[in-house]
Swiss-Prot record:
The keyword Cytoplasm applies. Keywords: Cell projection, Cytoplasm, Cytoskeleton, Sensory transduction, Vision. It comes from Mus musculus (Mouse). This is Spermatogenesis-associated protein 7 homolog. The gene is Spata7. It comes from the Eukaryota.
Length: 582
């Protein structure tokens, strides 16, 4: 029994223990709890050792009642294999990040030493000989230089600050004078492997800060303020199709305005241009006499009477009563034409409205304190839009144009454009001045035009002589008026009066069938009567022109071949009526 137990015990001895006897602290002999003398024997110690080994083997070989091992399907699953591979890659990335951080900190600590060493090497005089192989070997001692070599000295491009760039340019000049040094460097560099990276010096990074400080060489004008630019496109928003969407209003582009900063709040920039603008405005303020309307208003009568023709070429000062005066040099911001108090077209109330309009504009400019051209254009357009329903837009624009001249906003570079703008405003304002008068003048002009036309037609009809085309003989003292159709014609009455007649009767015979002229110095009087054009249109035909010729009493004509008309007396001519169709 003991033998079999001993053999069994020896069969389960642990693999990690040597088969030799226990000595030293492993035996129970040196144990403080050993009190029995029998335990000091070697056989007892071996039995205890075997017993404990068997006990631990049983514990390690024990199995759970529930199988918790990994199933076979998991090991054969592709999804599980991909999951394990991703976990492995994640661990590798974490390890690489740790190594990169450590190397980065080491590079930062050594960067200053590297830069100082390289700058000192560049500052050496060109006369001293320097071995390029030794120089490269010294630089490869540092970790920042160990990964980069250069195939030739001509490919050396370093990212240095401006001071280092100046030194680098100096060394390149000295290197060009000594070609032997380049050849030596080329032979020395050819010994290096071709797989090496390009040589670069790792300097300290640019310190964090403003872009203007980092890249100051890329910005030309640092004093100009930052003005964001918006992309102007003709594309329309999709929301414009929505019934409740109100699109943004586009600003009108003025071609003659100058681009200035919105934040300009001082008048110092306008002081230099103010004197020159006054000189140019005084020259442009001269008004051409031909452009001024040749009409004046009478105080007693509400009619327009044209000025005499010889007064058109006179100067402004020669016109009496102060109706029109020559504009002064500072009249660029005022009206170019002035009227006397008795011939004013605009009332005092309207002038007060214009004065209040200019006062509101100037008050808002002074309140905001902005004097840029863009701001002034916006302000003027807003006030014009606000007051255009009860004030003349042309006069408002002319007054605002004068205000811009006073502020010096109009440059002297384009005097032609300035003069053209002033002439347009003057014409617009003059058109507004005579807009009311044209209503009264229009009827009178049409009437006078028709009168002149009908008078000329009557004279043409009187001077017309019957031709052969009529194929008829006219009686003495009778003449025919050809039919003439005139639209909207007036009524004309023509009378032929005999001032002097011959009392003696002229003989009538076959040889001389015509009657001798018994009428001397006949006068023809033409009376022009105004007619109503509307009434003429209503009637389709009307007798407008009547011709009557009266002769003084004369002797009877002698009979022709003893005819019955021997005692007949011709006193008057027949009245011919001519109907003029519309």
């Amino acid at each position: 029994m003991d033998g079999s137990r001993r053999v069994r015990a020896t069969s389960v001895l642990p693999r990690y223990s040597p088969p030799c006897l226990f000595t030293g602290h492993l035996s129970t002999k040196s144990n403080a709890f050993c009190t029995d003398s029998s335990s000091l024997r070697l056989s007892t110690l071996q039995l205890v050792k075997n017993h404990m080994a068997i006990h631990y083997n049983k514990i390690l070989s024990a199995k759970a009642a529930v199988d918790c091992s990994i199933p076979v399907s998991v090991n054969t699953s592709i999804k599980y294999a991909d999951q394990q591979r991703r976990e492995k890659l994640r661990k590798e990335l974490a390890r690489c990040e740790k190594e990169f951080k450590l190397s980065k900190s080491a590079m930062q600590t050594n960067s200053k030493m590297n830069s100082k060493f390289f700058v000192n090497s560049l500052q050496k005089p060109s006369g001293e000989p320097q071995d390029q192989d030794v120089f490269i070997e010294e630089m490869t001692r540092y970790p920042s230089f160990s990964k980069s070599l250069i195939p030739s000295s001509e490919g050396l491009h370093l990212s240095l600050p401006e001071s280092s760039k100046m030194l680098m340019s100096g060394t390149q000049k000295h290197a060009s004078t000594s070609p032997s040094r380049h050849s030596g460097c080329g032979h020395g560099c050819d010994r290096r492997p071709r797989s090496a990276h390009q040589f670069q010096v790792a300097l300290a990074k640019t310190p964090s800060g403003d872009l203007l400080e980092k890249h100051s060489d890329l910005f030309s004008n640092k004093q100009s303020p930052f003005t964001p630019r918006t992309l102007k496109t003709e594309a329309k928003s999709f929301l414009s199709q929505y019934r409740y969407y109100t699109p943004a209003k586009r600003r009108k582009d003025f071609s003659d305005q100058r681009m200035e900063a919105e934040t300009q709040t001082e008048l110092s920039s306008f002081n230099s241009e103010l004197g020159t603008a006054e000189k140019t405005s005084s020259k442009d303020s001269e008004v051409n006499i031909n452009q001024v309307p040749n009409y004046t208003r009478n105080g007693a009568e509400d009619k327009i009477a044209p000025l005499p023709s010889q007064g058109q070429n006179l100067a402004w000062d020669s016109i009496q009563d102060g109706i029109l005066q020559q504009s002064s040099e500072r009249a660029s911001c005022k009206l170019s034409t002035e009227f006397s108090p008795d011939s004013k077209i605009y009332s005092d109330e309207e002038e007060l409205l214009y004065l209040s309009f200019m006062e509101n504009v100037t008050d808002e400019i002074l309140k905001l304190g902005l004097f840029s051209n863009r701001f002034l254009e916006r302000l003027f357009e807003r006030h014009i839009k606000k007051n255009k329903h009860h004030l003349e837009e042309g006069k408002m624009r002319y007054l605002l144009h004068g205000l811009k001249v006073d502020l010096g906003c109009i440059s002297e570079e384009d005097p032609a454009k300035q003069k053209h703008f002033r002439m347009l405003n003057q014409l617009h304002f003059q058109k507004a001045l005579i807009s009311r008068e044209n209503e009264f003048v229009s009827d009178e002009e049409t009437v006078s035009h028709h009168e002149r036309q009908q008078y000329q037609e009557a004279l043409d009809m009187l001077s017309a002589v019957p031709k052969d085309e009529n194929k008829m003989f006219s009686l003495p003292g009778e003449f025919l008026i050809p039919a003439h159709k005139v639209k909207h014609s007036e009524g004309v009455i023509i009378q032929q009066v005999n001032d002097e007649t011959d009392n003696e009767a002229s003989p009538w015979n076959e040889n001389n069938p015509s009657v001798s002229d018994s009428v001397i110095d006949q006068e023809t009087s033409v009376d022009v009567i105004e007619g109503d054009s509307d009434f003429e249109r209503a009637e389709t035909s009307r007798e407008l022109c009547c011709l009557s010729t009266s002769l003084s009493p004369s002797g009877p004509f002698p009979s022709i071949n003893g005819g019955s008309n021997h005692g007949k007396e011709l006193s008057t001519l027949r009245i011919m009526g001519m109907s003029i169709e519309d």
